[in-house]
Amino acid sequence: RQLTGRILDEADILLVFGPEHREWILAGHPESSERVLALGQAGAVLSLLPHGVTIPWWSLAETVLARRPVPRPEDWIDDPYGRGEHAARITAQAITDNLGLLADRVSWDGRAEPSGLSSPPR
């Protein structure tokens, strides 16, 4: 799906692969800065949580930005297009690993408050 202003406005978290994605979003929607995370940035922070500990989805961006406010070069996932099968495998593994951390270490229960602020489940 094409990313639109409406999607950006409605999204609680925006996970991007490359710095060009983050820069493109922030150029047009600077107010989104606290919701835009590199997938690898989120994965790196989540990997540091003790085994069995999860965080609620509504605190993901805040947790990641508190521990790793700026994505590091290793947080970006390279586009493998035109770089061969080996590059595609590396990219697929990075995506799989980071999504696995999101699935294992983030609780996706809860809801957003009408004000747009997120709150824990009651």
Please report, for each region that a protein language model flagged, where it lies by residue:
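Short polar/charged helix/loop
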Residues: 1-122
